[in-house]
Amino acid sequence: MALPKTLHPALTPDELAFLAEHDHISIVPLFSMTRVRLISGIYGPFRPPSASRVPLWLGLSLKKKRKCRIVPPEWLSAERLQAFLRDEKENSEGFERLPRRFMEISKVLLDIASDDLSQPTLLRSLLKDIREVRQAKIRMGLQSEDVLQNDYLQVTNLTPLELCELKPFLVRAMGLMQTLRPPEEEEDEE
């Protein structure tokens, strides 16, 4: 492979954002057009003010050309993000389930279509708070007895972005823990 070894274990955040752009969103077109056939599918018809479902990449492209207004996902509202944050803080044992590609889609929409979102500054702040709470849980999980004694870390409900950030560290740490394990324990397992 042409990539350096440091990039083999995980995808980059940009690659994850690229993958997220294949998820579908709703747009309100500002133009009229019949169906359009693309490699990824057939989209349309586009008639304002009716909403249409398109891949995120197409919605972003139309938004940059001022041809549509992006309808934010239902979870990208101040009320829902506050609920996610509250639930995340209350659940000290694990991670709350977040929508698929939560961080990647949020970032792209806030960067490109912030004028289509209500209270984008508040949304950024809430997303940052959610991310910080989850990162604190990851740090606490890495220091827990389960990791030190049983060689595992529960990562249920982590987002792909969080897993990619954590994976290189975990691979090195687990390898180091295996070398520190006493020899008699290794023989018992075989």
Curated annotation (Swiss-Prot):
InterPro entries: GINS_A, GINS_bundle-like_dom_sf, GINS_Psf2, PSF2_N. It is found in: Nucleus. Gene3D superfamilies: 1.20.58.1020, 3.40.5.50. Its main location: nucleus. One of its GO terms (cellular component) is CMG complex. CDD domains: GINS_A_psf2, GINS_B_Psf2. Keywords: Chromosome partition, DNA replication, Nucleus. GO terms for biological process: chromosome segregation; double-strand break repair via break-induced replication; nuclear DNA replication. The keyword Nucleus applies. Belongs to the GINS2/PSF2 family. PANTHER family: DNA REPLICATION COMPLEX GINS PROTEIN PSF2 (PTHR12772:SF0). Component of the GINS complex which is a heterotetramer of SLD5, PSF1, PSF2 and PSF3. This is DNA replication complex GINS protein PSF2. The lineage of its organism: Eukaryota, Fungi, Dikarya, Basidiomycota, Agaricomycotina.
